[in-house]
Curated annotation (Swiss-Prot):
It comes from the Bacteria. It is found in: Cytoplasm. This is Urease accessory protein UreE. Involved in urease metallocenter assembly. Binds nickel. Probably functions as a nickel donor during metallocenter assembly.
């Protein structure tokens, strides 16, 4: 079994992608947080992945590349709640409440994105928050804030 220990590049940076045979390794956002991953590709080849602790896999990362072939990480769609608040105060209240639940989150300029949870959805409905449930491809996995000490 081949064990990958580094990320070589990302498929977004490769010119003439169509000239390569692409073997995909499909991972969930939970998988990419693991230190050691044993998984089969879409071509039924078993691989191991063990990256340095500070390295995290992202969609499109290339683990193997030669003149003809790429082995690429593909993150599966994640079931999420995308929250867009009416005001900054409302967003602060929602973020505080979800933080009390130790809910991991990602943020854009105008949105808070959290993994789907029926209790969180119920809270948002009860508080008449603007949100939508969607399946999206995350750029990186949900994780708890590493800045919190």
């Amino acid at each position: 079994m081949t064990v990958f220990k580094e990320i070589l590049d990302n498929i977004a940076n490769i010119k003439n992608v169509e000239s390569y045979q692409i073997e995909n390794i499909h991972l969930t956002s939970d998988d990419v947080l693991k230190r050691v991953i044993i998984i089969s590709s879409d071509q039924n080849v078993e691989y191991g992945i063990r990256l340095e602790e500070d390295k995290k896999l992202m969609d499109g990362d290339i683990l193997y590349k030669d003149d003809y072939k790429l082995v690429v990480i593909r993150l599966e769609l994640s079931d999420v709640l995308i929250i867009t608040a009416h005001t900054i105060g409302e967003m602060a209240k929602i973020a505080h409440n979800l933080g009390n639940r130790h809910m991991p989150a990602q943020f854009t300029e105008t949105q808070m994105i959290v993994p789907y949870d029926y209790l969180v959805e119920e809270y948002l409905q009860d508080n008449k928050a603007l949100y939508e449930r969607k399946k999206i491809k995350l750029k990186e996995a949900f994780k708890h804030c590493s800045d919190a000490k």
